[in-house]
Amino acid sequence: MRALFQCSLLRPWLALVVILPVILLGIRFAAAEDIVVPLRTQAQLIVKLAEYDRNLVPRPGPRVVLIVRGKTTASSRTAEGIASELRSYDNIAGVAHIEKVIDFVSAGDLKKRVQWESAQIVYLCPDFEAQIPSIADELTGLTVLSVGAAPSHPGLGSVVGFDIHSGRTQLLVNLKQAQRQNVQLHSEFLKIVKVIR
């Protein structure tokens, strides 16, 4: 009876020992894509950054910003939030603009949408960590600025991302991918960002 009692007391702890690492693993993966810079600040930096991209030339009609969302609620909220923040600006690099929120299907499909819409800026919401390298491959050769919402995104292949360092917002630039996507940033601007090569 005593052994049975001890066993029943141990069961909840055993379950916790088994379940807790799984929960923590899930938290770790979720944290990898956490947005640390507020969307309002991100929008402000995107607008400012566009002024320093020498290849972001005016095209007929408004400048198209594709906002790519995943299947999660957090991704959809991010998409609507950044679209709203960007719409508060009259122009991006002197040109009127339109934001289009689209669902991610595949890297190849995104390339087709960029070409079809003549998009010059692509914003990647959370949920794209695994797909960013293939997205980077597909966007290579196009003239498009890809912006990742999370700090990990530039290291995986977006041209730009955002982070917090010593309490300050930091703009991350993947210089190699910038060259692949014909993003030509002024050298003076590169002095104030963290360059990822």
Q: Which residues make up each language-model segment?
A:
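Short hydrophobic alpha-helices and adjacent helix-cap/hinge residues
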Residues: 2-7, 11-16, 25-197
